[in-house]
Regions:
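Transmembrane helix-loop-helix
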Residues: 66-100, 275-317, 398-452
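Membrane-embedded alpha-helical segments that form the functional core of polytopic membrane enzymes
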Residues: 89-92, 96, 201-203, 209-245, ...
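Solvent-exposed interhelical
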Residues: 34, 49, 247-280, 284-285, ...
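Extracytosolic (periplasmic/ER-lumenal) interhelical loops and adjacent juxtamembrane/interface segments
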Residues: 34-55
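Membrane-interface loop-to-helix entry segments
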Residues: 53-72, 117-127, 193, 323-327, ...
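Small-residue-rich segments of transmembrane alpha-helices in multi-pass membrane proteins
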Residues: 201-204, 325-342, 390-391, 451-464
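Haloarchaeal acidic low-complexity proteome signature biased toward cell-envelope/secretome components but also
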Residues: 1-31, 76-97, 123, 127-198, ...
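Helix-coil boundary and interhelical linker segments in multi-pass alpha-helical membrane proteins
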Residues: 207-231, 284-298, 333-354, 408-420, ...
């Protein structure tokens, strides 16, 4: 029986991926238009060869039938292997809703898109997907969880740090050229450059979406000056936030292996100089943002203050929900990019920000697992430290599912096309595969694999948004 449980988990994961592909494909305008080329049900009249619309419609219906069989098969295996009641109960919700989804699809095919049924069709599909993700999360918890986890803070001793003792080679012992190079690199490290590419890509996606929204997908308009000022201000804002974070966490950084070599923690740079550097970056950032518009400048200031003060000083050291609430800082670049083009807020920009917000815990909890003891030494109440690894892994599945739902909503309210659909489905499946492996292997390597998969998913999704939105 135990040997069959991994098969049950695999079937649940495959069912979730199949349902998600059906839902986002059905919500994509270009694909949905092709599906509507078939106005009969359950079969389509006319030759498939030479008619792309009929071919897509047939593929969609055959895939729906295959996924339905997979969901039924997963339920049968779950019953036979003695899956937990709440797993089977959640799976039963998907089983009940699946024929409802088929019926709604039939109504859409027979009556056209100008009815309330397409919205109900999408909502029901998302509900089925959510049920399958919930069943998968609980099954993985039952299959791989442990009951003997204790909070790391009870077992890891926090070392005392002498703040007056410098660490590392003194810069004064270097040659003039080496000293200048080392100092410049130390200031560069303060800006947390690894965060810049992804956050700037978020802003770029927001601008591309907005350009398509304002001018239409066939004629997007995006001024070069807007792009340069927005991304330039974003780079400086990220640098300022990172610098302030280094200053405020300098004592804690010395306790953690991952951060003990940071420039201020090792006394490579004086706190006074680093603080002045951060202020200069913030002022320069706001100056660039202000040239775009006042709302962008206000959002940029909010991003700097939220990450530097609210997250670093209030959330991170005091609540286990620091990562979840802290996702607000990462979502602001999406709004900055959108408002830079439109000058106001609208649903697609908010939806993109929502994707980033929900993705953040699914992404960062993997890093928190890999550095669990390090965060405990720093005194941070991260999810693995406070609630254990099993609970953290389960929440990764929850937030991954929520991220994919938000990405599905995005395609239903925009004109994004097949590239976006394929990207979110394919890379979402890879991300889910990495998370399932994380549950089964429970190693640092598996946590890093899931972490990199999360980066790949979001990076590819944002690129797909830019390409799809600006494609002529």
């Amino acid at each position: 029986m135990n040997g069959r449980r991994p098969r049950f988990t695999t079937m649940l994961a495959a069912s979730a991926v199949g349902v998600y592909l059906l839902v986002v494909a059905g919500a994509t305008t270009s694909i949905a238009d092709a599906v509507h080329a078939c106005s009969t049900w359950p079969t389509c009249e006319g030759p498939i060869l030479g008619d792309v619309g009929l071919a897509i419609a047939w593929t969609h219906r055959l895939l729906a039938a295959a996924v339905g069989v997979l969901v039924v098969g997963a339920a049968a295996v779950g019953i036979r292997t003695g899956a937990r009641r709440r797993v089977l109960g959640t799976l039963a919700v998907a089983l009940v809703l699946y024929p409802v989804q088929i019926a709604l699809g039939a109504f859409v095919a027979l009556n056209g898109a100008g009815t309330p049924f397409p919205g109900a069709h999408l909502a029901t599909g998302m509900a089925i997907f959510a049920a399958l993700v919930g069943a998968l999360a609980w099954q993985l918890e039952a299959e791989t969880g442990t009951d003997d986890e204790t909070p790391v803070t009870e077992t890891v001793e926090v070392p005392e740090v002498d703040d007056d003792e410098p660490e590392g080679p003194p810069i004064g012992a270097l040659s003039t050229r080496e000293r200048i190079t080392a100092t410049a690199f130390a200031y560069f490290r303060l800006t947390k450059p690894r965060l810049m590419w992804l956050l700037c890509l978020v802003a770029a996606a927001g601008m591309a979406l907005a350009a398509a929204h304002v001018a239409g997908p066939a004629n997007p308009s995006l001024a070069t000056s807007t792009i340069l000022l927005t991304l330039g201000g974003g780079v400086l804002a990220i640098g300022a936030s990172g610098t302030f974070n280094h200053v405020l966490e300098r004592d804690i950084d010395k306790r953690m292996d991952r951060t003990s070599d940071r420039p201020i923690a090792t006394h490579q740079l004086p706190v006074r100089n680093a603080l002045a550097f951060g202020i200069a970056l913030a002022v320069a950032s706001l100056a660039l943002f202000w040239q775009v518009n006042a709302i962008v400048a206000a959002l940029g200031l909010a991003a700097i203050l939220f990450y530097s003060v609210v997250y670093t000083l209030v959330l991170k050291p005091n609540t286990v929900q620091n990562t979840v609430i802290g996702g607000f800082a990462g979502s602001l670049p999406a709004l900055i990019g959108w408002v830079a083009v439109t000058g106001s807020f609208d649903l697609p920009g908010l939806a993109l920000a929502g994707i980033i917000f929900l993705w953040t815990p699914a992404h960062f909890y993997n890093l928190a697992l890999a550095y669990k003891e390090d965060y405990a030494r720093g005194g941070f109440p991260m999810m693995p430290v406070v609630r254990g690894e099993t609970e953290t892994r389960k929440h990764i599945v929850y937030y991954l599912g929520a991220t994919l739902v938000a990405a599905g909503v995005m395609v239903s309210i925009t004109s994004l096309g097949a590239l976006y659909t394929v990207t979110t489905a394919l890379l979402g499946a890879v991300f889910l595969w990495a998370v399932v492996r994380l549950h089964r292997e429970r190693t640092e390597q598996a946590a890093f694999r899931a972490f990199h998969a999360s980066n790949a998913y979001l990076g590819a999704l944002l690129i797909a948004i830019v390409v799809d939105a600006l494609a002529v």
